Amino acid sequence: LGLSCKRIQFTTDTLPSDITGFTMFNRETNSFEYRDGAANCQLLLADEINRTSPKTQSALLEVMEEHTITVDGKTHHLPSPFICIATQNPLGFAGTQPLPESQLDRFMVCLSIGYPTLEHQMNIINAQRYQNPLQELQPATTAQNVIEVQNYLTSVQMTEDVLRYAILLCEATRNHPLVELGISPRGVSALVKMAKASAIIRGRNYVIPEDVQNVYTDVCAHRLVLRPQAQADGKDAGMILQEIMDDIRPKAER
């Protein structure tokens, strides 16, 4: 993407200051100076984010929501655009613990890549036969282009009926008998933005119900907190969201 990038490996001893940075006294200047942390970049990769303590994870809350860092009472603005991508291990792996709901809600989408297919694995191996393919990578765009695309979202049209449909899908999670915690207003906003992005990818400047449906599970599944009865019934968040989509249809299909 042509962005400045930093990666931080989360472990049990990772400190909040590793993310936010810290101030230290400079004897030469006789003053305190701020030293950047991992979050001072345009693209932050938080690797194995669920292997660190809740205190360290909380250091990302302001970073992801406000795009600022506050250290010793002084606020530092992050460069634009700012994007945070994280990986996590399945719960049950050594040293893992669940992420707090407030942090999960700040991630716009959650994707599970899974294993590559046989064909993809062959392509991966063949690509490394003679040289490292990473050395051939070139930026596909620039930081300015990313900002322009983000700003273009505001011009994508969304009718009241489609907006109401998106909100109804989210509201249904709050009243579902198997859901303890449903989609928050932040989640609704993320669904609308992703639906607009889906429309742009498909060459349209307006959103249709299919755009909302295409991103609904990826945007909402990780935000749900299910009741114990859901596991007893053999249902996960994706199944519940699919049931909601089956029950609530767009206005034109009613």
What feature does the model see in each segment?
Residues C5, L43, I83-C84:
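Hydrophobic/aliphatic anchor position in the core parallel beta-sheet
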Residues E136-L191:
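Conserved AAA+ ATPase small/helical "lid" subdomain
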Residues N175-R254:
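C-terminal engagement/docking regions of AAA+ P-loop ATPases
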Residues I19, L60, F107, A166, ...:
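Residue-level signature of catalytic and energy-coupling elements of molecular machines
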Residues D47-E48, A59:
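Walker B catalytic acidic pair
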Residues F25-L45:
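Conserved alpha-helical scaffold flanking the Walker A/P-loop in AAA+ ATPase domains
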Residues N26-S31, R51-T56, M64-V156, K196-I201:
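Canonical AAA+ ATPase core
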Residues L1-T11:
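Walker A/P-loop
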